[in-house]
Amino acid sequence: MQNQSDKTYEVWHPVPRYDRWLETLDIPVYHEYFVGDLRTLRLAPWEERECNAAIVVFAGQEGVSEARVSEIPAGATLPPFKFTLDEYVYVLEGRGLATVVAGRRQKTFEWQKHSFFVLPRGYHHRLSNAQGNRAARLLHFNCLPLVMAVIPNPAFFFNNPSIEPDRDIFDPESEELFSEAKQVDEGGKREAYWVGNFFPDLRAWDKLRPQRGRGGASVATLMFPGTGVRVGLPTMPVGTYKKAHRHGAGIVIVIPGGEGMSVMWPEGQEKQFFNWHEGSAFVPPSRWYHQHFNLGPVPGRYIAIFPPRHQLFGGTRGEAKFQDDPHPQIEYTEEDPAVRRRFEDELRKRGIESRMPPECYRDPRYEWAYAGGSDD
């Protein structure tokens, strides 16, 4: 008769299954609120993937999303790999090729620094470094922690022969979206957004619209066909900052360029300030207020990678807002005056003047004049 202690089925465990899987890896696993530069993060060999890698468990991911950094050696091609989930890749350094394969069909596209693309679930893919003199470094985003909580078998997710693609990326419309994103405008109260499988340069992306209600920033919203993830590209003019706001967990923020500062804090508790630049990354914890400031001489931009919409949070298009939160945003008229003073002090150190309109601190209904985009 089998002893109770010998049973192999999954039972409740105080440590999440994803965390226990991390303990089996021989690569670094960082637990941080903020990483100053993903481009210089120490990696280690990952024999299974034949590359150097590390996983960053940000405090704000809270079992929702995964952030992984990998490095492709100079001139190398990583072995084919199939992942059960969609995975999203941002290029921190380098240029190369990505090939997505299903049987005899394949799609290859070129990527470069600041490119962003999706590796669709159920397909084999190969990643190649086109540079022979330096490594390429990538940031990967997926929702493995969340799904592994439901399917607590790591082998299910990696090179699983029983998993087949559930959407055809080789149909003419999908293939076209690897070449050029398309704008979608559904009219009504929904704002226009861009749909594609591949975005060549998020640092240079200039198709923006006003981000009304958040201050003077403009933004682009990027979507991926057949998936629930979206990406926001808020862009702040020189000498400005956004309103403090809060939302749910798992939204990874990475900086493509510029110089700035962010602050995060749980309501009623001490504020944590971080100075950022290209390669910095962080994740605001659930229900923590956070606020972003441009301290540089050029417009400041950050990339916000949102987990699947409609599944975790309320709000339209996965805004990750809580329906029961009466104060999801702090108006400039209500913010702690010390925040404004710190912003202006930081600008002074850099010889930059604040361009925040004095009226926005007096009138909560103040309407910004947007120079970075239009509603059209």
Model-based region annotation:
Residues 219-220, 229-233, 239, 251, ...:
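Eukaryotic modular interaction domains in large regulatory/scaffold proteins
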Residues 77, 81-113, 246, 250-278, ...:
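A short beta-strand-loop-beta hairpin characteristic of the jelly-roll/cupin
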Residues 48-55, 66-83, 215, 232-247:
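Conserved short histidine dyad/triad with adjacent acidic residue
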Residues 1-63, 155-228, 232, 334-376:
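A short, N-terminal "cap"/entry segment at the start of jelly-roll beta-barrel domains
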